[in-house]
Amino acid sequence: MAIKKNDFIEIDFVGRIKSNNAVFDLTYEELAKKEKLYDPNMKYGPRIICVGNGDLIKALDENLIGKEIGKEYKIELKNPFGDKNNSLVKILPVSKFTKERINPFPGLQINADGMLATVKSVSGGRVVLDFNHPLAGKDIIYEVKINKIVEDNLKKLKAFVENLLGEAEDHFKVEGKDNDFIINIKHDIPKALKDKFKEKAKEVMPDIKVEFVIAKGSVKE
């Protein structure tokens, strides 16, 4: 069975930098520990995605269309994050960081001026910041195992909330059956975001009806 856009599938994957085989993305907890990448705040295990809807990096997402359920693939992506842009490398005085009680060191990722940057070097009272994507200019390889297609609307909707709204599973609860569902959320979200979610959900699950409810005991923002 070939995968189509808007199909919900369960997958496992490992993403590696082609030049040195270093792992940067994965779903396997044991491998994360072995590679010293384990993060106790990260959710490991098979992931449910909606194909073609940006749940993965664009080049990988597009590459899944036409693949077969139950098979494993090695997918090479040529420079998916674009070339490095030298204008995105900035030099700042170390005093700017000490004022914010930040001790900069090479490899540290920080939010600067609303953008994610990586500290490349610290010397002579200066800090070199790189605002390029950490994988800019690199070819990568994903080893993808396509476990199964997901048909259950409840599982689809849970995955859609996590992937589209960026909400952790312990921050919401989806209830309902067949085509009618309620999403209980701990913190209210803007109406525009709710409407956008419903619109996107209707595109990929045209038969369902969704309403948001603030969980009992939560404070409406």
Regions flagged by a language model, labelled:
Residues 1-221:
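FKBP-type peptidyl-prolyl cis-trans isomerases
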